[in-house]
Amino acid sequence: MKHLSVKGYTLIEIMIVVAIMSVVTALVSPLLTNMTSFWRLTQARTLIQRDARVSMDLMNRAIRQAQSSTIVLSNYPNQPPYSEISFTDVKGNFVSFYQEGNYLYEKFNTTVSMMTKNLEFVSFTFPDSSDPGILSVAMTTQKSTYLGRSKALELSIEEVRVMN
């Protein structure tokens, strides 16, 4: 009688493979979740830092060129107090920075451009009401990350000296 060669896996071998794969999956899943969370957090931090620095730099440069007698602090409709500044610069251009929702806009004469879409709060104030040549600018940016969390970066208040 011929002996038949049966090829295949036994039930025990399959159960061992399933058990090993289950253990590996259980160990790798949290690692992948943590890696994704870290990557998105780092990406959000980099984005909001860049947005905040660029926006603050552009606002500071423009405010330095303002005619101090033309500076008006107000708020855009339905926005936080003192979230808008408008003035005329030394060349006679009308300049305005304002918050609308989570966006920061710059208006230069009639041209409006978005500076950042990650704005949480911006405020323009005179720290010393007797000196209209010094203005404080405070700004908070925020970006959503992984699993509904958010990362916020608050820049400290920067004082800007109006040169004109």
Feature names for model-found ranges:
Residues 24, 71-72:
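Short, hydrophobic secondary-structure boundary micro-motifs
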Residues 46-47, 53, 70, 114, ...:
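Residue-level preference for alpha-helix termini and adjacent loops
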Residues 72-131:
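Type IV pilin-like appendage domain
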